[in-house]
Amino acid sequence: MKLFDVYPLYDINIVKGQGCKVWDENGTEYLDLYGGHAVISIGHAHPHYVEMISNQVATLGFYSNSVINKLQQQVAERLGKISGYEDYSLFLINSGAEANENALKLASFYNGRTKVISFSKAFHGRTSLAVEATNNPTIIAPINNNGHVTYLPLNDIEAMKQELAKGDVCAVIIEGIQGVGGIKIPTTEFMQELRKVCTETGTILILDEIQSGYGRSGKFFAHQYNHIKPDIITVAKGIGNGFPMAGVLISPMFKPVYGQLGTTFGGNHLACSAALAVMDVIEQDNLVENAKAVGDYLLEELKKFPQIKEVRGRGLMIGLEFEEPIKELRSRLIYDEHVFTGASGTNVLRLLPPLCLSMEEADEFLARFKRVL
């Protein structure tokens, strides 16, 4: 059997990681400014993370959600405190797409509606309704194209008001900062108006913080810059630092019903140990504050490069838009300067490093970046 060939791959085999660096099988060191799609939050192979997962797998890796798992309760309590959402409830699953599927399902159970509002260039996952809410027709199969979703321009207040005024929208789902869409930031005016109109029309507001959350923006959640509280928040990626895990943070307005939501692997003992280790390190090493400080520095320095059309972002979630396609630039960064970066579309270079990126590593990236321009 061979692998189903759906990933365009760089010819590099990464075998080791430490902090913000990774090494290939030949021993070549790379600076990781991408964190595997924003997944690596506290750094590769953090000693505390390794210790907690190792101890847990030696004791109990998994048992089902038919018995008490006190680690889940610890994750919920800690996440409530660290995020400022102590009065919300937590449902644990394995991936971002699952988080958004369950969020949308919960919203529809709540108000009985079936219509969803998403936004231009949004990305919410690759399954069922999550992919239908993703504004990319090339990955929406006919079986997923069921007419539930209307896409609106981001930050267009009037278009949003007109659509919600119809009174038939189940949920609005929006990213705290658009990631795949090119590091596009919703304005505070738009987000506050969206919160107001959702409340007035009985529409559930879902904040997809899968890429922009967990401290990446310089606040725990990117929407906290906008001073709003959504009804549901979805998290994944950074929650487990590479261990598959995700969560749905649910407002007290929703009442749980036995059997309404469910999962086999979600919230397993290993995943919870990973999540607890991540929160330990985020707090002990002040990684949210570090993301803001180092991110602000990078944003300021990158704006000095005349070759870049526009620099966007918050914290360590940064997009560099160029006039021309960035494919060759990205290749030179990887093969010549040994720096991993990401892309959004054809013209935006995406930076999503671990939140422990130091000022010295930021300077090293800037020096290498300058050499390839």
Protein language model annotation of sequence segments:
Residues 1-373:
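Conserved N-terminal phosphate-binding loop of PLP-dependent enzymes in the Aspartate aminotransferase
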